[in-house]
């Protein structure tokens, strides 16, 4: 799910165009055409996102272990592991799940950001997983649980601390991370969903949720191109046009199942993202009502310039830098491990004149 400015301008511009195609009969008969159209919009936005961020990452020394097959030699999904240059072992683990409305995206889309996070002294895992319509619910959830098992089983080999794990995700990845956290911390939920959690509750120290989708009753009522796009994606992901009536939709709804056992949470969303008012803020409120420690980061509705979906990856923006530094502070708090000292990133990453010159072309490409 992306309403984006970068990933932000993508859905806002792209979903409006896609909504116009919704009148085509093919889009009503089968989820595949809609899913592939939405996937195309997201893929274009994600490529531009990586292009903009990667050259502007400070030179942290990070060891990269790419393409680790967590399902064994026969399993296609893989994960990437980014390790900081430090003798301090074992390292707390951040397991990041990428977004893409359950129908698009890849771990490569968030890799530059994860390298920055690893530079602060944490082992950061970017997990790839099967997307729909090729794979439907609950394939992704079970794969992500297997990835969690892989991290624990290979902790000694890579110098990881299996007792200090933080789940994380953006957009649909935030929903998947929250669902996995429910399975780890709530045995009744795990039993109902058929997930045998790969970690004990005490090993999960916290969760990072950026711009997620959590309440599917709200999605069913959501107006405009964003609501249209999400409902088409859920048709594809659940395998049913009547997705709201499926067991999958019930399992995926986080507020319905969360209780006081849910892990400490950092939750963030931009004021220009439709999902903030309908999803992130209500979940933050609900978790606090339940007594869960919550760090909230939101902006006033009239804040300018508006912060779109997944603005956190736009490291040229001071608000994204603030989000990153608050993320690191949250990791320090929940893991009990101090971050490595770094030069303030705002001194290293700037919005150069050449990037400003690129913006009109980027926006035109996204709109097309």
Task: Give the predicted meaning of each segment.
Residues 3-368:
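Alpha/beta-hydrolase superfamily serine-hydrolase fold, recognizing
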């Amino acid at each position: 799910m992306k309403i984006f400015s970068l990933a932000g301008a993508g859905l806002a511009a792209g979903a409006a165009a896609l909504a116009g195609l919704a009148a085509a009969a093919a889009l009503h008969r089968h989820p595949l055409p809609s899913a592939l159209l939405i996937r195309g919009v997201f893929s274009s936005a994600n490529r531009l996102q990586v292009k903009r961020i990667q050259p502007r990452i400070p030179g942290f020394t990070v060891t990269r272990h790419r393409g680790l097959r967590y399902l064994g030699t026969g399993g296609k999904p893989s994960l990437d592991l980014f390790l900081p240059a430090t003798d301090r072992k074992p390292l707390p683990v951040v397991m990041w799940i990428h977004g893409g409305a359950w129908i698009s995206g890849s771990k490569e889309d968030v890799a530059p950001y994860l390298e920055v996070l690893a530079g602060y002294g944490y082992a950061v895992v970017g997990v790839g997983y099967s997307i729909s319509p090729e794979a439907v619910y609950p394939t992704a959830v079970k794969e992500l649980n297997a990835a969690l098992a892989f991290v624990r089983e290979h902790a000694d080999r890579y110098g990881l601390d299996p007792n200090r794990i933080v789940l994380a995700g953006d957009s649909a990845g935030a929903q998947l991370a929250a669902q996995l956290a429910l399975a780890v911390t709530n045995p009744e939920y795990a039993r109902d969903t058929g997930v045998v959690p790969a970690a004990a509750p005490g090993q999960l120290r916290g969760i990072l949720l950026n711009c997620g989708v959590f309440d599917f009753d709200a999605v069913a009522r959501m107006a405009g191109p964003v609501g249209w796009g999400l409902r088409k994606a859920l048709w594809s992901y659940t395998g049913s046009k009547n997705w709201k009536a499926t067991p999958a939709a019930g399992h995926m709804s986080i507020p319905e199942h969360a209780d006081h056992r849910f892990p400490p949470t950092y939750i963030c969303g931009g004021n220009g993202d439709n999902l903030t008012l309908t999803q992130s803020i209500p979940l933050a409120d609900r978790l606090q009502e339940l007594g869960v420690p919550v760090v909230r980061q939101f902006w006033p509705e009239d804040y300018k310039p508006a912060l779109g979906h997944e603005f956190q990856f736009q490291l040229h923006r001071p608000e994204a830098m603030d989000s990153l530094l608050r993320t690191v502070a949250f990791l320090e708090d929940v893991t009990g491990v101090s971050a490595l000292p770094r030069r303030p990133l705002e001194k290293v990453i700037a919005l150069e004149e050449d990037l400003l010159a690129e913006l009109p072309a980027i926006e035109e490409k996204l709109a097309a």
